Amino acid sequence: MAKKKGENYDSDGGDDQDYDEEPNFDDPEGFVDDVSDEELLGDFLKQKPCESDGVENVIVVDNIPVVGPARFHKLQGVLEKLFKTAGTIVNIHYPKDDEENTRGYAFIEFKNPEMAEEAVKAFNNYRLDKSHTLLVNLFSDFQKYSDIPKEWSPPEPQPYKMQNDLYNFITEPDAQDQFCVIAESSPGAVQVQFWQNTQPEPVELLTRDRFTETYVKWSPLGTYIVTFHKQGVVIWGGSNFTKINKFPHSGTQYVDFSPCEQYLVTYGPNGQKIIIWDIRTGTEKRSFISDGTSNMSMFRWSHDDKYVARMGDNAIHVYETSTFYLLDKKSIKVQGIRNFSWSPTDNIIAYWMSEDLEAPARVTLLEIPRKNEIRNKNLFNVADCKIHWQKSGDYLCVKVDRYSKSKKDKKDADVKFLGMFYNFEIFHMREKDIPVDSVEVKETILAFAWEPVGSKFAIIHGDPASANVSFYEAKKGQEPTMLKKLEKKICSHLFWSPRGQFIVLANLQAGSFEFVDTNDFTIMKSGDHFRASEVEWDPTGRYVVTGTSGKVKEDHGYHIWSFQGKILKRVNLKNFILFLWRPRPPTLLSDEKQKEIRKNLKKYYAQFESKDRIRMTRASKELLEKRAKLREQFVEYRTKRVSEWEEQKYRRMQLRNNIDTDTLDADPDNVEEEIVEILVREDTTLLE
């Protein structure tokens, strides 16, 4: 026990007590601490006061209207209403001259520096009216601009840094696709494996432990893969998946790429910021404050990355990506808008608006940037609509949920719809005046899907326990015609091949699948994958993957099937999370060249079959060599174990009273056979 400071002890009679000396906590002489205060107290030091506190919260707004006392309050109200959208305003100061006229600029203080920065990004070069465009800067920028040297010195040339080949994955001679497999290696650690789908066995390209904290996502053309971390997200690319850029946005839950991969949108937790980034430079282009509701995929992109749009209250906000300002500096007013969607090939927006008093519901096609309404369709007794574009942009289908009558609930004032039936409004986008055809179905609609390449579409309708699958075709100048109706199918989802023609009818509750060729509607094969919850085609339409993720307790893993329904590989993987094929960019060949290749495809059959035979022969040889090597290893292992067993024979006999038990079973005279009968159950049957 250590002595207490200031406590006295009697030297006489205290000999029987043993007190330890107080330990010395001082650093030894010459000790140098290699850990900085920033590493130990980083979070605490962020709160340390500094000289710029208060100044960083202030912005300077130039080019505001010069007004007198009579119009000052109106100007004050306009500016406060405008800037409070960026954050909490603490104070506003308007410098005035001797006649109480404003001087054309103002100082605004916000609650924190983040709000001030948001105000600068949102309102710098903001057009207040025809004569005034606001110029907004941080007050702390004055020092930065005043320190600019008067004499310019040219920058020093930097050595050239070799860039990654981001497109090497599409140069594979046999067009074998890549895929990644995500699994949880340990709690809080996610492993990502990258594979090449070679035949007959896939080849592992790379494995990254702790590559991401949640999941990964491919960009639309397969150039990048994004990983999620506490501080933000990182994109990777190239043959070895090296880091390309990072985007700091704490707590990012979801990301979205623009179709041409020029921009990345990061979505923070609900109620927080949404940021649009330039992928190549890593700079922030524009940020928005979420309204607190679910904001996943709040922004929707045009096919060419020229525009991005989001839905507001009775309006569509369309931004030009060259400046990220509103198109024509104003929103598109649409009273009662419920949803909208871009065409996948043209700058056309399809939106629908709900019924309002005597006005019917309406579907409208809007051409951007001229904002011309190129087609309208009025709809009556509408409960809901779903917009489905065909991938080639040739057709648009609007699924309309209609009712015979409605009833308002007295308790919660909700409207209940009775006598439901369904219409499919088919817009022929490539024909003059965009004619519209209608297909009516009385039964409940469970699923709808367009053929990506072609003019067919499929629907699942009826009772989920015994549904029907109907296939229709939309031809130019004709109404949609039913091609085939498959009855009594237990399926819930439709998955078309990206190349068209083939479709998978899936029941994700039971894990059963049917592979259908829609040329003659033959069911090529049926199969099961117990508890499978995911289905994904590869980009070429040759393979299908079904997977069971961590949502179920056992049987995690994935199966690879051919497009004909033949199962090629079963992989059981503990803590399997996700399987993702790597997307491919669209072909550079023209439509005429593709038609020519299809026409002369028979010329290449012999070449393809020869390559397949060589590949299978090589694979068979490698497989035989692998088996022979494994057999040699087993024989070597068995020989060692037999030798050890023989060496231990003397010891075994000592333990067993010098009885050689190794040969007991070999001599039948040493074996006694005993038959034991056990009464399991006794039943009594009365005979009449």
Swiss-Prot record:
Subcellular location: Cytoplasm
UniProt superkingdom: Eukaryota
InterPro entries for the chain: EIF3B, eIF3B_RRM, Nucleotide-bd_a/b_plait_sf, RBD_domain_sf, RRM_dom, TIF_beta_prop-like, WD40/YVTN_repeat-like_dom_sf
Keywords: Coiled coil, Cytoplasm, Initiation factor, Protein biosynthesis, Repeat, RNA-binding, WD repeat
Gene Ontology cellular component annotations, sorted alphabetically: eukaryotic 43S preinitiation complex; eukaryotic 48S preinitiation complex; eukaryotic translation initiation factor 3 complex
Function of the molecule: RNA-binding component of the eukaryotic translation initiation factor 3 (eIF-3) complex, which is involved in protein synthesis of a specialized repertoire of mRNAs and, together with other initiation factors, stimulates binding of mRNA and methionyl-tRNAi to the 40S ribosome. The eIF-3 complex specifically targets and initiates translation of a subset of mRNAs involved in cell proliferation.
Protein name: Eukaryotic translation initiation factor 3 subunit B
Gene: eIF3-S9
